[in-house]
């Protein structure tokens, strides 16, 4: 092979790698776009123990739209009913159980195929300390399931498994 041929082959290879990379990036984004139902959520702590903040049968929904907006709601399936039937007069114990057993947040999102991550820029959350923050999450896809992991506030890694809603 002469120099010109080697140059053409190398250039073609580099172009196909960068085109392939662009397709992969669009691929992860396209795979994430949609409506998702929560299957499980747990925190694996540094000592290996697991915590299921939202219980063994969590409820949740996540929306990721094409324009880069998202919303997520996660909760326990056994949240207590408010005895007074009035959210404004719930007891301290009821409020605590509801706050500790649920979370919701929304904002904008982007995906990075090269790192297998999603960046969530949180506009507002039921946990106000998240307002205006960025959270980088690892994402892995398997068929109609998406596993999303992020460092946990209690130490370790928090992972949620979502199933595409049809």
Model-derived segments and spans:
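Bacterial N-terminal signal peptides that target proteins for export
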Residues: 1-8
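Bacterial N-terminal signal peptides
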Residues: 8-17
């Amino acid at each position: 092979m002469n120099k010109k041929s080697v140059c053409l082959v190398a250039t073609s290879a580099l172009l196909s790698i960068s085109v392939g990379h662009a397709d992969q990036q669009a691929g992860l984004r396209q795979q994430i776009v949609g409506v998702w139902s929560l299957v499980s959520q747990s925190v694996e702590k540094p000592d290996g123990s697991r915590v299921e903040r939202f219980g063994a049968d969590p409820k949740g929904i996540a929306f990721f739209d094409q324009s880069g907006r998202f919303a997520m709601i996660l909760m326990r399936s056994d949240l207590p009913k408010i005895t007074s039937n009035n959210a404004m007069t719930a007891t301290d114990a009821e409020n605590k159980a509801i706050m500790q057993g649920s979370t919701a947040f929304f904002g904008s999102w982007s995906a990075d195929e090269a790192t297998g991550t999603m960046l969530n820029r949180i506009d507002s959350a039921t946990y106000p300390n998240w307002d205006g923050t960025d959270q980088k999450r690892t994402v892995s896809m398997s068929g109609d399931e998406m596993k999303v992991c992020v460092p946990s506030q209690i130490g370790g890694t928090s992972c949620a498994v979502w199933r595409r809603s049809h």
